[in-house]
């Protein structure tokens, strides 16, 4: 039974740094500071970089 606690602690420690690197852009200020613009859809030479505070408004950055 003790091995389960050790295994859980090991997995928790190994996965905790990944949460910091998986966050997307979440505000218009952050989007613009990364060189993006807030639009309804990312077309052409733009790619999705996150959202601008609302799920339907996307932060689009050049590819």
Swiss-Prot record:
InterPro entries reported for this sequence: Defensin_beta-like
Chief place of localization: secreted
Disulphide bridges: 31-59, 38-52, 42-60
Modification type Pyrrolidone carboxylic acid: residues: 23
Gene3D superfamilies: Antimicrobial Peptide, Beta-defensin 2, Chain A (3.10.360.10)
GO biological-process terms attached to the record: defense response to Gram-negative bacterium
Induction: Expressed constitutively and induced by lipopolysaccharide (LPS).
Places the protein is found: Secreted
Function: Has potent antibacterial activity against E.coli (ATCC 25922).
Protein name, as recorded: Beta-defensin 6
Species: Mus musculus
Gene designation per UniProt: Defb6
């Amino acid at each position: 039974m003790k091995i389960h606690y050790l295994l859980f602690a090991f997995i928790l420690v190994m996965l905790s740094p990944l949460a910091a690197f998986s966050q997307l852009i979440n505000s218009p200020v952050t989007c613009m500071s990364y060189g993006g613009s807030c639009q309804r859809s990312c077309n052409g030479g733009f790619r999705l970089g996150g959202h601008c505070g609302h799920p339907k408004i996307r932060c689009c950055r050049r590819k």
